[in-house]
């Protein structure tokens, strides 16, 4: 199931413009900050959430770089 989620996420972000990707990146970074804070204060129910968000940030950064190299945006 995670494989399907990952592929769907990649398909979705590849369709977005650079501006949309940068906005998504900001949202993901904010989510990671919230998770880090929550982890310190009360602990996380699912620690894998942080890992998932970090990997999604990396995926978005990769797609942004791909688009920059192709001259899109």
From Swiss-Prot:
InterPro entries: Ribosomal_protein_uL29, Ribosomal_uL29, Ribosomal_uL29_CS, Ribosomal_uL29_sf. One of its GO terms (biological process) is translation. GO terms for molecular function: structural constituent of ribosome. GO terms for cellular component: cytosolic large ribosomal subunit. Keywords: Ribonucleoprotein, Ribosomal protein. Pfam families: Ribosomal_L29. HAMAP family: Ribosomal_uL29. Belongs to the universal ribosomal protein uL29 family. This is Large ribosomal subunit protein uL29. It comes from Aquifex aeolicus (strain VF5).
């Amino acid at each position: 199931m995670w494989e399907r989620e990952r592929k769907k996420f990649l398909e979705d972000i590849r369709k977005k413009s650079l501006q949309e990707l940068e906005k998504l990146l900001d949202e993901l970074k904010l989510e990671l900050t919230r998770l880090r804070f929550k982890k310190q204060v009360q602990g996380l129910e699912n620690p894998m959430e942080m890992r998932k968000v970090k990997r999604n940030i990396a995926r978005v950064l990769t797609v942004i770089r791909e688009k920059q190299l192709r001259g899109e945006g």
